[in-house]
């Protein structure tokens, strides 16, 4: 192992998985944006609200039945696909002796649905799903919790996310943060960081 980094933490959606939702729903893209940026959704991602209560509250906010909100997210999660380039990079990192983790904001039902998907889950040394941990990005306590759980210093950890605010939070606790805007460029940057 030639790298000084011991761990790499990756976001899921938009980083390790891509999605092109082809969803048959009454929920507009605008409403979807309103939902995922709401306090109710953030509490759902922290595991603080039961699914039926969350979907009912969100449905009331946009004038649709909660069952329609639930169905939309089941379909959307079903549209996630692993990014082959990033999966290959995970294998490379493991080969370099770097522990690989996933840290994602995700409600429990979506996480359990995702885990049913055929994927190389054994690549991960650990998975931190917000709803199961009771905290979410960009809350600094979530990053500190993960560092404690993986028993690695922030300076020895690389963090990759497609949301800039999450990268800034990782940098605030001392991690090397990479903002993914293009998977090829990010893969190259990661290889440079850990390469011999």
Curated annotation (Swiss-Prot):
UniProt cross-references to SUPFAM superfamilies, sorted A to Z: HAD-like
Pathway where it operates: Secondary metabolite biosynthesis; terpenoid biosynthesis
Domain of life according to the entry: Eukaryota
Q: Name one GO molecular function term.
A: phosphatase activity
Reactions catalysed according to its record = (S,S)-drim-8-en-11-yl phosphate + H2O = (S,S)-drim-8-en-11-ol + phosphate
Per the entry, induction is:
Expression is regulated by the secondary metabolite regulator cclA.
Which Gene3D superfamilies does the UniProt record give?
Answer: HAD superfamily/HAD-like, Putative phosphatase, domain 2
List each coiled-coil range: none
* Keywords carried by this UniProt record: Hydrolase
Does the record bear Cytoplasm in its keywords?
A: no
Q: What is its EC number?
A: 3.1.3.-
What's the stated role of this polypeptide? Answer: Sesquiterpene phosphatase; part of the gene cluster that mediates the biosynthesis of astellolides, drimane-type sesquiterpene esters that show antimicrobial, anti-inflammatory, and anti-tumor activities. The first step in astellolide biosynthesis is performed by the sesquiterpene cyclase astC that catalyzes the formation of drimanyl pyrophosphate from farnesyl pyrophosphate. Drimanyl pyrophosphate is then dephosphorylated by the sesquiterpene phosphatase astI to produce drimanyl monophosphate which is further dephosphorylated to drim-8-ene-11-ol by atsK.
Family assignment from sequence similarity? Belongs to the HAD-like hydrolase superfamily.
Q: What is this protein called?
A: Sesquiterpene phosphatase astK
Q: Which gene encodes it?
A: astK
